[in-house]
Amino acid sequence: MDFLNDIKVYDNVLDQSAITEVFEFLSRNFYTLARTNDTDALERSKKFLRLKRTEEELQEFKKEFLQQQMADAIRDKDLKAEKLYWTRIHKGAPECTQEDELLCAALYEGLANVCDLPPYEALGNVYTNMLRTMDRPTAHIDNIDPKNRTVMFYTNAVWHRDWGGETIFYDLDDNIIKAVQPKPGRVVSFDGRIPHSGRPPVTSAYVPRYITVMKF
């Protein structure tokens, strides 16, 4: 399970001026409610990842996973508040604006200064999740395909160690293997097969925790 060790943290990817500008953009924009991650889906993915799989098995699992997501979407209108979270899509959706595209380009440029990246055109989707005190995020796996990668920007202008908001990474037995504090300008890049979850900010933060995510 070498992929569980593939977690890289980069600090000061954005300077304070840039991160403040990004935060101001994110904090004044509109967010929509989306369905939170499904615990059963996580358990199915973990079971699949425990064994070595063929390419055919991988593609079949991805197909079944997508079909389940589509079935779940039909029932989304009946979800209670604790099963929802706030998100904004910046790339890959009709509602994206020119400002969203400028944000994506700026974040990509900053990241390119600290690590090797695929071409910008290979960037799949970009979105920001807003996590508030009392929200109930659940652990999940982004993608079981070994060719994928998740990059997470911490986009609050200010954050204190006592405010919570960490990203927690787990092994396949639910043991915590790493916790990453959401310091402004920090980026964590990881194999999307690693189970992880966000921690909500504690009451003393008085602000939501923002993360902007790129999927490659």
Task: Give residue spans per PLM region.
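Non-heme Fe(II)/2-oxoglutarate
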Residues: 1-117
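Catalytic core of non-heme Fe(II) oxygenases with the double-stranded beta-helix
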Residues: 108, 112-216
